[in-house]
Swiss-Prot record:
Record keyword Repressor present: no
Source domain of life: Bacteria
Pathway(s): Cofactor biosynthesis; 7,8-dihydroneopterin triphosphate biosynthesis; 7,8-dihydroneopterin triphosphate from GTP: step 1/1
Class of the enzyme per the UniProt entry, highest EC level: hydrolase
Lineage per the UniProt record: Bacteria, Bacillati, Bacillota, Clostridia, Eubacteriales
Record protein name field: GTP cyclohydrolase 1
One GO MF term attached to the UniProt entry: zinc ion binding
PANTHER family assigned to the protein according to its UniProt record, in alphabetical order: GTP CYCLOHYDROLASE 1, GTP CYCLOHYDROLASE I
Length: 185
């Protein structure tokens, strides 16, 4: 559970530390706004994707399923600034599938907390393998990191791409190629 009072106190201290007047008209409600925003953007802390991936439907097909271009927003755990982009999830069912919105909810669970893109990619894949008992999973995450855009090297538009493979995707290069082709369609 997020402690909004601590966040408000901390935000006031930060504003004072950078030389701002916390009682100024434009800032007086900022600590409260930040606390409410953090409650939303860090709502994945302590959550598990199991509740979203546990309701499945029987299928008589083991054909590839791809949900692509799932938009995500997260916060870099190193600088607490946003990174955002698209997630592409491909999996090979093992007789059961999940509702497509549940894949997006899985992304939300793992992106709504201080995060690393590499870990986000792995957590999504691992949860789908575990809770769907999939024959294989491939996850591709494309992200733009504000820690590279607005500070440091200042390279707007630079994208980080991470991938991970589980099950049949580790063994079959043509499956990977099919997914990359489908993502680019």
């Amino acid at each position: 559970m997020i402690d909004k009072e601590k966040i408000k106190e901390g935000m006031k201290l930060i504003l004072e530390a950078i030389g701002e007047d916390v009682n100024r008209e434009g800032l007086i409600e900022t600590p409260d706004r930040i606390a409410r925003m953090y409650e939303e953007i860090f709502s994945g802390i302590g959550m598990n994707a199991k509740e979203h991936l546990s309701k499945t439907f029987e299928v008589h097909s083991n054909d590839l399923v791809l949900e692509k271009d799932i938009t995500f927003y997260s916060m870099c755990e190193h600088h607490l600034v946003p990174f955002y982009g698209k997630v592409h999830i491909a999996y090979i069912p093992n007789g059961r599938v999940v509702g497509l919105s549940k894949l997006a909810r899985c992304v939300e669970v793992y992106s709504k907390k201080p995060q690393l893109q590499e870990r986000l990619t792995k957590e999504i894949a691992d949860s789908i393998m575990e809770y769907l008992d999939a024959q294989g999973v491939m996850v591709v995450v494309e992200g733009e990191h504000m820690c590279m855009t607005m500070r440091g090297v200042r390279k707007p538009g630079a994208k980080t791409v991470t991938t991970t493979y589980r099950g049949k995707f580790l063994e079959d290069e043509s499956l990977k190629n099919d997914v990359f082709r489908m993502i680019s369609m």
